[in-house]
Structures are given as C-alpha cells and as structure tokens.
C-alpha cells in the first residue's frame, strides 16, 4: 500500500510574485510561518525552520525551486518515512491559486493521527498566509506560546475553548470569516474574525486590536491524553493589547488544564 498525500488549496487575492516571496524570502516566511529560517532556498541546499517560542525546529532539503511557480522540499521526521512538500502557484485573474501537496504519510490507522494533525496545520497556515499578505506583508512579528499536556480526549478539549474564564470572557467561535468579540481576563475588549477552523485540532483567530493572530491547538497523544497549546503573535507588538494577551497565555492554559481534569501523567501544566 502506498503512502498517503495531504492536499490543500486556496485562492489568495495577491499577485503570484507576493505569494512566492512569502514562501521563499526568509524574512517573509518568518512573518507568517516559521519564526526563523536558516539557510538558502537553493536546489540541493538544506534549510532549517525554527519556532523559537515552541522550542521546535525542522531541517528540510530543497529539492526544486522553479520561480515563481513551484517549490519542493523534503524532510524526514524521526522514526518515519521521508515526506515531500510541493507548493505550486498559478495566476488566477487578480489573484493567485495556491496548491499544496504533502506526501509520505503512513496509510490506514497507523498514520491517521499524523495525517489529521498535518492537514489541520496546513489549513490554518494557508489562511494565516492569506491574512498576512492582505494586511501585514513584509512586516516582522513577535511570538509567544504556551504548551501543556492534559489528561483528556481530543474531542473534549475544543468545546472548552469557548468557555468563559480560562482565557477571557465568553468566546463564541463560528465558521471561517465570522466575527469574534470578547474580553480578556483583564477586561480588555478584543475584536476580529475567525481565520481558520480545523477543529477539534486547531483554530486561528485574527485579532484586530493586537494586529495579530491567536492560535489554539490540541494534539492527540493517545485516547486519553493530549497536548494543548496557545500561540499568539503580533506584527505590531508594541500594542498594549498584544502584551496583555501574550502575558496571559501560561496562566490561562493552566486554568484550561485544570478544567479538563489536570495534566497528563508525566507532565505538568
């Protein structure tokens, strides 16, 4: 049985040159995807993508760079087969058609959770990319994140994202594009819209008052445990609303873990 492929497409209302730059210029990549990029995107070279706020990094081999239409990268996750990411861009009137294929996933139940998590990640990332290009192209950002293991099933976590008290007042999350309005635990009013919804694994909220994004995620560890996380960033980090939201992440996550029954065995919130 062959390896499985994840696909994601999106029409982005920006010219191909801008979308290509967002995938290949390290400064622009750091504006929406990895927080830091080391290396050159040249065929045969290797690049490292770093998420410093999460303590994560991956190394990728550059397989093909066909400016401004096609980019192919390959990486080998620990203990798993190699995976290949292909990004293709095409003119679509006054916009760009983005097509992503990410292959090399184990078929069937063996790779089901990794496929689902990666698919959720690409749905979120592509919508964040569109938001970045529409409002903040070329701007740098400041990121903060918090992670915690929790003794809860994946499907039990997402409903609590909307529960008052853990992060803010009541946070009603609708479909992609729907407006949001809530108050932080400190009482500050925030407004924005849902950028991406890939529940129960991820949700991304564009926050107008912070000039940034809040991503909530849950990663299944086993049938009774998960890793929950919150990541916030801003392209205008001097805004007081961003500083307040970023400072609230760790205590807010501790409250969420407590509401779910406590940390998973071997971890602490």
Describe the function of each predicted region.
Residues 1-7, 13, 261-269:
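Actinobacteria-biased recognition of intrinsically disordered, low-complexity terminal regions
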Residues 20-23, 32, 75, 122, ...:
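Signature tryptophan residues that serve as conserved aromatic anchors
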Residues 7, 14-18, 24-70, 142-145, ...:
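Short beta-edge strand/loop motif at the mouth of beta-sheet-based domains
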Residues 106-159:
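Surface-exposed beta-loop interaction hotspot
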Residues 18-20, 153-159, 239-244:
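Short, conserved charged micro-motifs
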Residues 123-134, 250-264:
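Short amphipathic alpha-helical signal-transduction/dimerization elements
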Residues 70-120, 195-258, 267:
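Beta-strand/loop substructures that line and gate deep hydrophobic ligand-binding cavities in soluble
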């Amino acid at each position: 049985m062959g390896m499985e492929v994840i696909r994601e497409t999106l029409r982005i209302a920006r010219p191909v040159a801008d979308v290509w730059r967002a995938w290949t210029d390290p400064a622009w990549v750091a504006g929406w995807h990895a927080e830091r990029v080391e290396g050159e995107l040249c065929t045969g070279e290797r690049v490292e993508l770093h998420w410093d706020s999460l303590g994560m990094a991956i190394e990728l081999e550059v397989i093909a760079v066909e400016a401004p239409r096609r980019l192919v990268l390959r990486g080998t996750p620990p203990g798993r087969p190699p995976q290949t990411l292909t990004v293709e861009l095409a003119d679509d009137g006054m916009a760009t058609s983005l097509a992503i294929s990410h292959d090399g996933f184990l078929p069937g139940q063996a790779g089901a959770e990794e496929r689902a998590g990666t698919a959720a990640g690409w749905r979120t990332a592509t919508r964040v990319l569109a938001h970045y290009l529409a409002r903040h192209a070329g701007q740098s950002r400041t990121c903060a994140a918090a992670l915690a293991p929790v003794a809860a099933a994946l499907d039990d976590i997402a409903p609590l994202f909307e529960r008052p008290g853990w992060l803010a007042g009541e946070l009603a999350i609708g479909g992609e594009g729907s407006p949001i309005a809530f108050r932080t635990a400190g009482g500050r009013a925030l407004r924005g819209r849902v950028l991406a919804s890939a529940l129960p694994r991820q949700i991304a909220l564009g926050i107008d008052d912070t000039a940034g994004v809040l991503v909530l995620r849950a990663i299944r560890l086993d049938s009774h445990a998960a890793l929950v996380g919150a990541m916030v960033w801003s392209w205008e980090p001097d805004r007081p609303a961003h500083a307040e939201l970023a400072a609230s992440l760790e205590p807010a996550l501790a409250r969420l873990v407590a509401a779910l029954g406590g940390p998973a065995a071997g971890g602490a919130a």
